Amino acid sequence: MRVYMKRNRLSLPIAAFVAMAASGSALAANSTNLDVNFTATILETTCNMKLVGGQGSDTVQTLTIGNANGEVRLDDVRNNAATANFQIVIVECPASLSSLKTTVTGTPSGYLLTGITNSLAKGTGVSDYSAVTIARQTASTTPFVINSTADAERLVWTETEISNKSVPLVASLQETKASSLTVGRFEATAVFEFEYD
């Protein structure tokens, strides 16, 4: 499974300021003075995050489920034993950080909304009816819904996780339809999108 991180950046729209400035110039021709006071709150909106537990860089990693060769027994998948642990770690965030929400994005399985489907084209040697789920290690049976921005369905960091600057996660290979899982290669990509307050 390849894991990416994506940072959301906020930008201040300047079109409103341009429109206000243009209307102010037009009014000046009529000898009318307008005083405009702008009030703004400037926030530091980005954090630096990294992944720990797989192979690769801090922001793009490959996580192997199974043995060193990525081999997993069919029974292990069906018994929820085909897993790999990893973490998202805060490297640097503003001291004012009070809320951190993470959406797990990818191509969801049509049978399992919490699973990211196999990205390999169906065919000989490719696993079918398989997906990978991502959950907290402390709540491994409650995976996040893929692409959901609803707080109840995505990773909302607790105060303790923010304070510890880390959230331990588990990726689990799952069967998406009972008695349908086929053996073969499996690859999936998850992207983590962050919202900060």
Protein language model regions, located:
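N-terminal signal peptide c-region/cleavage motif recognized by signal peptidases
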Residues: S23-S25
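Mature extracellular/passenger domains of Gram-negative fimbrial/pilin and adhesin proteins
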Residues: R2-L10, L27-D197
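Sec-dependent N-terminal signal peptides
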Residues: S11-F17
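Generic structural signal for beta-strand residues in well-ordered domains
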Residues: A19-A21
